[in-house]
């Protein structure tokens, strides 16, 4: 679309302005701009192709051939960018020095802007390619050993088989060793479990003892309460008895006084009787 | 004693050994050293023979072996082997790799003897055994506590009986005290009445004399 507008813009003013020297002036002034436009178009196409290759990185299509193609495409785009940049500079110099028309200046500015946008896309594609190349490794196909010689192939296969045999043997030894270690650790764990179980039994016994002790202490608490109530009742009864005895003592003291008084009266009466009888 | 024989070797070369009793453990252990599987790889093994078990531990090319009772289990013998290995490496260091047979026996057999004694008899050698011992002590203390509480219960039974008797006695004492007070009161009443009668009689007799007759004729005329 933008290229169509560019071509329309470049072609439409040509026959109107340069009616006098048509053949000489359009060819000398139109070549850099047209070449820049063509270069930008090719760069854009190459960048799209580069993007397709970059999207294949990390998939089963990712092979060494793909990586080589990526590298070639990158170099091709760099070369195109270099050429187009030189032509763009040439066109801008012609615009500055020569008495170019306003429409042409605007067209060249637009070309420069398009060139910058294409460059940005290329840089983005390059950055993405770099990230993916670091993250993933290409799939090594089996076609590569076909380039070897027959004796080298035999030597390689023999070496590989020997390595596999040694690896298998060492793994078997490791398995035996691990089995021994597992047996040993299981025996240790079994013994530890038994010890812990015995401790658990002892703790359970102690728990039962504590419960029995609690029951007995609770029962004896009731007995102590009975003892306390008995003592309180005894104390109260003794206090009341003491009060009664105190009253009895007071009454007895009064009785003694009365008894003395009676004896005194009898004495006086007896004395009077004796006096009367003697007289 | 749980651990009876101990030995330290490099490969099949015996560097030091000690035996608590006279047995054929030395020859049997040599056979075991020759038959150990694996080439200088770290491992733990246990071989049984009659009533004894040979425990073998190999670490960094140094082999430690001990013969123990079946009742000793595995925790204590292997803890013993770990301890002996550390002490041996700490004491002799790099000399282990180039030592002659039995060259450390004079010095290290005493250490073997001490550690055999420690791991066989001291309950602190194993945390599990120590906890079992402590739980046994706790259980014994609880049994004593229960006995004391039972004894206290019996005494409390006697005490409650005695206090009930005392309560009955004090109730009876109170009743008798009240009765005694009543008796004293009545006696006081009787004496008062008697006194009044005697006084009345005396006054009557005196008036009889003064009025010249028992019927008091002159006083009421």
UniProtKB/Swiss-Prot annotation, chain A:
GO BP annotation list: Golgi to vacuole transport; late endosome to vacuole transport; protein targeting to vacuole
Coiled coil: 65-94
Biased composition (Polar residues): 21-31
Spans annotated as Disordered: 1-34
Subcellular locations according to the entry: Prevacuolar compartment membrane
Domain t-SNARE coiled-coil homology: 186-248
Highest taxon above the source species: Eukaryota
This protein's record includes keyword Plastid: no
Ranges of the Cytoplasmic topological domain: 2-258
Main location per the UniProt record: membrane
An MF annotation (GO) of this entry: SNAP receptor activity
Tissue-specificity statement: A high level expression is seen in the roots while a low level expression is seen in the leaves.
Modified-residue entries (N-acetylserine), positions: 2
Transmembrane regions: 259-279
GO cellular component: late endosome; membrane; trans-Golgi network transport vesicle
Any Pfam family matching the protein: SNARE
Membrane topology annotation: Single-pass type IV membrane protein
Purpose: May function in the docking or fusion of transport vesicles with the prevacuolar membrane.
Subunit field text: Interacts with VTI11 and SYP51 to form a t-SNARE complex and with alpha-SNAP to form a 20S complex.
Family, per entry: Belongs to the syntaxin family.
Name of the protein: Syntaxin-21
Curated annotation (Swiss-Prot), chain B:
Keywords: Acetylation, Membrane, Protein transport, Transmembrane, Transmembrane helix, Transport, Vacuole
Record-stated family: Belongs to the synaptobrevin family.
Domain Longin: from-to ranges: 7-112
Assembly with partners or alone: Interacts with subunits of the vacuole protein sorting (HOPS) complex including VPS11, VCL1, VPS18, VPS33, VPS39 and VPS41.
Function: Involved in the targeting and/or fusion of transport vesicles to their target membrane.
Protein name: Vesicle-associated membrane protein 713
Organism whose genome encodes this protein: Arabidopsis thaliana (Mouse-ear cress)
Tissues in which the UniProt entry reports expression: Highly expressed in stems and roots. Detected in flowers and leaves.
Spans through the membrane: 191-211
SMART domains in UniProt: Longin
Topology of the protein relative to the lipid bilayer: Single-pass type IV membrane protein
